[in-house]
């Protein structure tokens, strides 16, 4: 099997393992929800716990058409998959980092000029939830690939229904806006249809 196919198979295996870990996390939350009123001290605590766990269960729902991760960072011989939510294995070790996590910021901000200790930034291509391709940028060597075809394909993908999730396509300038302090006023300018509201949302 060629090296590219071997690497793609390994990433698909990680995706499958991450989906299984997410399923276990949801089952655990459902078990807690089922027994929550038995361990709560009073009716108010039981109701609060129930609402919190119901939100958690909804947050842990898996959509097989949506990839769990869209990128990977290789930093000091460690691989960190970056996605839309945090997923852990049974020992609590991260399998997928939430895109909002501090370490994930490097996925958006690192460059060949300022690699931020990132050796490789990998972007994944998906079709209906199936991992089909990847592109690597060797930032630690000072190599930047330029415009990513995977990124362009994601940006140009037809939009259907409500505003689409944009976390896989955030650019460095947008990332700075998304992570700005809440008490900071920001003005975003641009032509209609260019995604101006996205950082605010």
Task: Tell me the role of every PLM-derived stretch.
Residues 188:
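Hydrophobic anchor at the beta1->P-loop junction of P-loop NTPases
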Residues 185:
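Walker A (P-loop) ATP-phosphate-binding motif of ABC ATPase nucleotide-binding domains
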């Amino acid at each position: 099997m060629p090296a590219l196919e071997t690497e793609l198979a390994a990433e698909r295996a990680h995706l499958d393992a991450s989906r299984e870990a997410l399923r276990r996390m949801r089952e655990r939350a459902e078990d807690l929800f089922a027994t929550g009123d038995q361990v709560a001290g009073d009716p108010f605590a039981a109701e609060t716990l129930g609402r919190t766990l119901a939100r958690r269960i909804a947050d842990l729902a898996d959509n097989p058409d949506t990839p769990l991760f869209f990128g990977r960072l290789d930093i000091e011989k460690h691989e960190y998959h970056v996605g839309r939510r945090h997923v852990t294995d049974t020992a609590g070790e991260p399998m997928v980092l939430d895109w909002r996590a501090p370490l994930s910021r490097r996925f958006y901000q690192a460059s060949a000029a300022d690699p931020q200790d990132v050796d490789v930034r990998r972007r994944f291509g998906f079709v209906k939830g199936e991992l089909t391709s990847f592109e690597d940028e060797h930032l630690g060597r000072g190599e930047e690939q330029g415009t990513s075809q995977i990124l362009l394909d994601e940006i140009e993908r037809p939009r259907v229904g409500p505003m689409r999730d944009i976390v896989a396509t955030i650019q460095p300038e947008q990332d700075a806006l998304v992570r700005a302090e809440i008490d900071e006023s920001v003005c975003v300018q641009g032509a209609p249809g260019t995604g101006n509201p996205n950082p605010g949302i």
